[in-house]
């Protein structure tokens, strides 16, 4: 590990020199690429330097113990040795995590697709609860939320809705939300007070650049039509709504949120690219490790990941067996406690994999 850390530190110094070179700065595209690489290494280098400093201090204190006869100074050195030993253990763990293979999509913006599942109108209302939860979470993170497409019901639910969430680390946090979410509660329309179980499916897709995926224009069928609102009534007198079908896969994306047909087409294309990229990534991951099932979950949208139980005020994440009794604040966007636990479990799984490889 130390050999790799020394290499990273040297690389960081090399990049520091490059990004301050006027000749490199003249090429803005290359300079921005180098700046990003430099920023990615910074936390590793800073942690490694802190680790080296703690090691030096530890050796210094050990030397003092050998040479010092003063009782008070020896006790101080022993106390410092104890603290530094614990600190070095913590820093070593931090460095191990920082050196784990990074998901190349972690820094990307995301699309979140929420679809009502089993449960009719109640499932559609639950889909709207989930949308609000992610919107409130994004607000806490100072991320931007943009509606891409939606299919609303008459009572305020959503049959399906897609939003873009833009901000630093959006995918790295939200990627764990893909899967089936289950709600247990008494619907407002239920006169007997019987608890119903409904579901909604969430898919989290990283936004992709044109370089990440190439779409042949001949593989697309683009239809335009008039946008409709609740209950199907027409809300636009022009054909501004857009439906794009990717013929080889049968994937269909619609967008009618904007008044401009061009803007709707741009939005629909972004979502289509993200879906195609996700499908390609899933296929690649399956071929690499088809027998590995991560304890954190596969990210498969058919996997039941979480239950929201209203009578008990309970949320249970089935992937890690975590139960919290804070349903109200959780649905108000306070979801970091679960996400942190999922991140920790994911890192532990990666460390196990690394150990098997080594």
Curated annotation (Swiss-Prot):
InterPro entries: PCRF (IPR005139), Pep_chain_release_fac_I (IPR000352), Pep_chain_release_fac_I_sf (IPR045853), Prokaryotic/Mito_RF (IPR050057), RF-1 (IPR004373). Methylated by PrmC. Methylation increases the termination efficiency of RF1. Keywords: Cytoplasm, Methylation, Protein biosynthesis. The modification N5-methylglutamine is found at residue 233. PROSITE patterns: RF_PROK_I. Gene3D superfamilies: 3.30.160.20, 3.30.70.1660, 6.10.140.1950. It is found in: Cytoplasm. The keyword Electron transport does not apply. The keyword Cytoplasm applies. GO terms for molecular function: translation release factor activity, codon specific. Pfam families: PCRF, RF-1. One of its GO terms (cellular component) is cytoplasm. Belongs to the prokaryotic/mitochondrial release factor family. Peptide chain release factor 1 directs the termination of translation in response to the peptide chain termination codons UAG and UAA. This is Peptide chain release factor 1. It comes from Clostridium botulinum (strain Kyoto / Type A2). The gene is prfA.
